[in-house]
Amino acid sequence: MVHALEEIHRVTRPAGTVIEIHPAAVEFPLLEVKSNEELSFSEDDPGFDYGKDSLHAEKAVATVIGRGLFVLDDRRRFELRTHASSLQELRDHWAVADAYDPEEKEETLARLREEMYARAHEVLERSPGAELEFVEPAMMSRLTPSAKP
C-alpha cells in the first residue's frame, strides 16, 4: 500500500487531496436489529478477518506521512452503516461486495457468521418493521501531498 500512496503522491501534487478510507483496525464490525431506533439485537461480527489488512493500511499512511510525502489535514473515525430489511437483502449485498474479495472466508468464521445471522433473523421475525444494520467502524484521513518529490 505504501507504493500505491507513493504513486498517488506523484499524480496529485502539488494541488490534490487524497481521502484514504479503511476499516478500523481494532474495532469489530457488528450486526444490529433496530425497530423505531430501539436496539433489540447487537453482536460483534465473528466473520471479521481483515484486522491485519487494516493494520497494514494504518502503517502505510503513517509511513508516507513520516517520510514527508503527505501532510495529515484531518483524521476521524466514522461508521459505515449498511441497512437491510431482511437477512436475504443483507446476504445479497454481501454477495456483491464480497465478489471483489479473492479470499474465501475461513470455514469456522463463515459458520459462526451464519449462526449470528440466525440469531438476528429470529429477533427480526419477532419485531415487525425492524431492520438490520451492519455497522463497520472505519477511519478516514485527508492527506495533502507535500511539494517533496
Where are these regions (language model features)?
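Conserved Class I S-adenosyl-L-methionine
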Residues: 66-149
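Short, structured coil/loop segments at alpha-helix boundaries
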Residues: 4, 28-34, 41, 101-110
